[in-house]
């Protein structure tokens, strides 16, 4: 099995595999140390007005505020073309099929839509998946200090931005959770977050496991 990870995030009109549509897909490949390889790919897929008007209010508002809805209307890219674009990028860095796991946050939902709409992409990926949200849930139970100290999450709700956040989140857990017991102090956690956010001087932190994250 190769060391690369294929990070994918999808935006849909909803979460129901029956009627809902895949309208944006982005992909980034990283090496085993989570260094991004290449520029990645981000594709907005056309959907008709009937599909867009069927979105529930919270999803419609989210995609309207992010600008995705208008981009979907204007897009001329169909599903097959989008799949080919994603595979072309992944193929630049992952040469053999079924060798690179799919990675992301709550990635099973994304993979369900990929399996439905992009079977060649689904078949190219290894069956194993690395779900950052699983690590988050374990830290909440085993290392609450790490969980409550995690970097704030943005609210872009766009595929490529969400992938960058997921990679940064796994970098955070790698540097704070995947260390010998009892794990890092709150001050060490704060320093990791500051480094990942590009902040020179980390603020002082109280060594508490109860302070909730800001995002």
From Swiss-Prot:
Show the HAMAP family listed in the entry.
Oligoribonuclease
Which residues form each disulfide bond in the chain? none
Q: Please name the GO terms that the record assigns under molecular function.
A: 3'-5'-RNA exonuclease activity; nucleic acid binding
The EC number on file is 3.1.15.-
- Provide the coiled-coil residue spans: none
Record-annotated active site: 127
Say which enzyme class the record assigns. hydrolase
Q: Where in the cell is it found?
A: Cytoplasm
Where does the protein principally reside? cytoplasm
Keywords on record: Cytoplasm, Exonuclease, Hydrolase, Nuclease
Protein name from the UniProt record: Oligoribonuclease
Reported function? 3'-to-5' exoribonuclease specific for small oligoribonucleotides.
Of the GO CC terms on this record, one is: cytoplasm
